[in-house]
């Protein structure tokens, strides 16, 4: 009976994943994430919590995964689309090589200023070129220039979901073969598994955009992908050709 019960339990866990409770999520944060989070990132996370749009910030669990990936890949030229207060940007700047550079674009300079003092305090401001711009305009300008095609080692996207597919078509040309693009919020609060009729109205527009992106990434022969249930979902894409 015990064996059968355990078998049923682990079959269900294998199918659905373990993170079915807030307690387990908090355990991971308390045991493995927060003890490893740098003091500068911790301060920025706390500062972001007082922002009225704090829910837009990168989760510390996703930030840890991002840092781990960057320290492994060691990209020297990266681009970040969507910055908000800069948690993921600071995590990137702390993780790439000393001579690494980040082009960061966001329309909201005020939100970026929340984290700027901590970016300076961490001593990594020189790695960052922050551009106040509509991201589509910047990406189109980079492609039109010609010098930037296939020049980036890594891209991170956490911006307006309505343009995720458009960003993908541009970033796939801007990252080099073997380079990586990471998209945040690709599970959209878990609603991607729901039929559209069950998605709350306030989430529906972005639900359409995120599910469309997921379908495209799942069938795009130009990339290998890993879609992970970390934070609000993060998808890593490696350009194959």
Curated annotation (Swiss-Prot):
Q: Where does substrate bind?
A: 14, 158
The molecular function terms of the Gene Ontology recorded here are: caffeoyl-CoA O-methyltransferase activity; metal ion binding
What top-level class of enzyme does the UniProt entry assign? transferase
Q: Can you cite a GO biological process for this protein?
A: lignin biosynthetic process
Reported cofactor(s) = a divalent metal cation
Free-text remark on how the cofactor is bound: Binds 1 divalent metal cation per subunit.
Question: What are the binding positions for a divalent metal cation in this chain?
Answer: 158, 184-185
CDD domains in the record? AdoMet_MTases
Which pathway does it take part in? Answer: Aromatic compound metabolism; phenylpropanoid biosynthesis
The identity of this protein, by name, is Caffeoyl-CoA O-methyltransferase
